[in-house]
Amino acid sequence: MNILNELNEACNYIENNIENEIDIKEIARITNQSTDSINRFFVSMLGITIKEYIRKRRLSLAVYDLQNSDEKITDIAFKYGFNSYDSFCKAFLNQHHVTPTQAKNPSCEVNIFPPATFEINVNGAQKIKFKICDLKEFEVYGISKNFNCQS
């Protein structure tokens, strides 16, 4: 199994267990990676840790529940693993920039974080227009990252 399949397996596991306690060690076991490795892959591919990904997904699904059910905010908070109403409201406000009560309104703007999928897209065979010219000396700065797509 290559790393993209493993990351997709991790995301599927998270989605299927989003209302339960999610153990990062179990995700590591499923993906045949260490907890540090799986976390590094999430950070390098999504820019957030796996715990942040889980929190963002839970808070996104909470919006759906707020707008489409009669569940109390407290019940939704506990459903998605928050220990208190206050911690849920604080995290909700941090992600969505509105309170859970305001988010009950379907016209309210929120920041939904969709489920992640990992794939490789290869585009090519396009005609490239170019021009060769002499330039003055200049410096180039950048950041390089190497990814091993094989386990």
Enumerate the predicted regions with their spans.
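…primarily DNA-binding HTH/wHTH and HhH modules…
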Residues: M1-N5, E9-N12, K90-F138
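Short coil turns linking two alpha-helices in DNA-binding domains
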Residues: T31-T35, N83-Y85
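Short, well-ordered alpha-helical segments
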Residues: I143-S151
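Nucleotide 5′-phosphate-binding alpha/beta core
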Residues: N32, F41, I48
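Terminal helix-turn-helix DNA-binding modules in bacterial transcription factors
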Residues: N8, N12-N16, E21-K25, S44-Y80, ...
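Short hydrophobic/aromatic patch on the recognition helix
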Residues: I38, F42, S87-F88, F92
